[in-house]
Swiss-Prot record:
Protein name, UniProt field: Protein RALF-like 10
GO biological process: calcium-mediated signaling; cell-cell signaling; regulation of growth
Signal peptide range in chain numbering: 1-17
MF annotations from Gene Ontology: hormone activity
Entries under InterPro entries matching the protein: RALF
Subcellular location field: Secreted
Source organism of this protein record: Arabidopsis thaliana (Mouse-ear cress)
UniProt keyword list: Disulfide bond, Hormone, Secreted, Signal
Length: 73
């Protein structure tokens, strides 16, 4: 009797699980792009900011400065 009930439960679970898996046939846009989600990872920019040129962290100057006291050619 127990084996029959267990077999029926397994069959019933398999019949119910098939339609649940076949409902979604496409991916959501939020799954594809991580930056579109509510909590974007570091490195994501707000919409429209990717076209702008990034600002440099520090300005590069070639050669020596007064403070380093290095020889000049």
């Amino acid at each position: 009797m127990k084996a029959l009930v267990i077999c029926l439960l397994v069959i019933f679970a398999a019949v119910i699980a098939v339609p649940v898996e076949s409902r979604r046939k496409h991916l959501d846009y939020g799954v594809i792009t991580k930056c579109a989600g509510p909590n974007p990872p570091p490195g994501c920019y707000p919409p429209g900011a990717q076209q702008k040129n990034p600002t440099p962290a520090n300005e590069y100057r070639r050669g020596c400065s007064k403070i380093t006291r290095c020889k000049r050619d």
